[in-house]
Amino acid sequence: MNEHPGFCPACFASLAQEADTCPACGARMADLSKRDYREKIVHALRHPLADVRMRAIIALGLRGEPQTADALVKCAMRHPTDVVQGLEIVNSLARMKQTGAGRTALSILQARHPAHAVREGAARVLAALPSEGEADA
C-alpha cells in the first residue's frame, strides 16, 4: 500500500495514513493516484493550506498551459485576501502563452479582483503584452 499525506486528495478531509478509502467522501486512494498530473495540480488549487495552493500555482505557471487559466482565476477569487497568492497567479498567467484564455483571465483579475495590488498587477501584465493583432503577425 502506498502512503499518502494526512489529507484526502479528493476532498482534503483529515485522513489516517493507512486508510484505503476516505471516510468523508468515499474516494479510494488507489483510484486518485491514477489521475492525470495536470488534473492533480488543478485540484490542489482548492487545498485548504495556502502553501499547497502556492506550489500548485507556481507549477501551473511553469507548465504554461492556457487551459488552466480559468482554474487560476477561480482560485484567486476564492481567496481574495491572499494578495501574495493573487500576485503569483498573475505571474503564472503572464508566463503562459498569451492566448485568448490568458488575456481573458488577466482581464477578469484586473476588473474583478478585490485586492488593488492584484488588479494593478494584472493591468501591468496586460499593458506589456503585444496587442492581439501584433501577436498574430
Question: In which residue ranges do the predicted regions lie?
Answer:
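Structural signature of alpha-helical solenoid repeat scaffolds
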Residues: 13, 26-27, 61, 77, ...
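Short inter-helical turns and helix N-cap capping residues of alpha-solenoid HEAT/ARM repeat scaffolds
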Residues: 48-49, 79-82, 113-115
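Cysteine-rich micro-motifs
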Residues: 18-29
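Residue-level detector of extended alpha-helical repeat arrays and alpha-solenoid scaffolds
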Residues: 19, 53, 69, 83-86, ...
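Amphipathic alpha-helical scaffolding segments comprising HEAT/armadillo-like alpha-solenoid repeats
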Residues: 3-7, 23, 32-44, 65-78, ...
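Non-membrane alpha-helical segments in proteins
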Residues: 53-59, 87-92
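Short metal-coordination and nucleic-acid-contact micro-motifs, chiefly zinc-binding Cys/His arrays
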Residues: 1-4, 18
